[in-house]
Amino acid sequence: MKKQLKRTKKHDKKDWKQSICAKCKGLCCKYITVDIEEPKDDEDLDNIRWYLIHDGISILVEDERWMVKVDARCKHLQADYQCAVYNRRPEACKQYDTENCDYRTVSENLPKAYREFEEYGRLRRYVKGRWAKAHRGRKKKR
């Protein structure tokens, strides 16, 4: 696992300028995600539909993890894409892993680690397919 670059007051700017973060335009600072439960039935799916009728909202699915993505730029992201409160940033920002960051995915042309759904119809088809696959799996075990 690669060592995550940590900037502090004693930070060497030369190292930071060579880091992946220095090449990025703050992609991870332009949205937040909130974990949600995977929908188990049509009522759950309709509740997720409510999220998707709002602008700037999408659903991310990464393996068994489900999240609501809210497009919302951090108020501390500066014009040069650096953090204005870097030394006092929240713990979530300190723990952010650059190994699977959005910039690396785009710059290295890697597949995303998650599926993103902005449109309910596409999400509904995906979920119904998962339910059908799970149902077939249960029938085979009998």
What are these regions (language model features)?
Residues 1-142:
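Short loop/turn segments that flank or connect secondary-structure elements
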